[in-house]
């Protein structure tokens, strides 16, 4: 596994999963000038990144410690885990907190029942359906 070179390790954000949500987050963070690295098991997924994406990409299985270490997870400021699989997301969040002490971990979950698996870890959970509903309510002026 080859680590990216020339990466500024200070204030780095790592995104795990380059599906629709991960690519959107990575593209927006890149546009904001964030120091960014994104990991996905499929190189084809990176085609969703914009042409002006300024971060780094790593192809690999995110549950593999060697892949996580090649993404400099030990020194990242924040980790955003947004694969389409709750089980993988919970596992990577647990690894990030318990093994690497990542200070800010954000995890996408589809099933609210899985949130209990992260209880006590200090992980912030993202529920896309709830966010969509909240935005919908704001649009229609509901309180």
What are the residue ranges of the model-derived segments?
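Cytosolic regulatory regions of ion transport systems
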Residues: 1-143
């Amino acid at each position: 596994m080859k680590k990216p070179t020339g990466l500024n390790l200070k204030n780095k954000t790592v995104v795990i999963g380059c599906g629709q949500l991960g690519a959107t987050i990575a593209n927006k963070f890149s546009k904001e000038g964030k120091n960014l690295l994104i990991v996905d098991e499929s190189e084809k997924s990176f085609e969703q990144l914009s042409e002006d994406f300024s971060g780094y990409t790593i192809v690999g299985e995110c549950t593999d410690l060697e892949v996580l270490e090649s993404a400099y997870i030990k020194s990242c400021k924040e980790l955003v885990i947004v694969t389409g699989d709750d089980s993988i997301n919970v596992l990577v969040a647990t690894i990030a907190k318990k093994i690497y002490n990542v200070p800010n971990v954000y995890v996408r979950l589809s099933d609210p029942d899985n949130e209990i698996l992260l209880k006590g870890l200090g992980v912030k959970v993202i529920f896309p359906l709830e966010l969509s509903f909240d935005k919908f309510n704001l649009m229609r002026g509901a309180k």
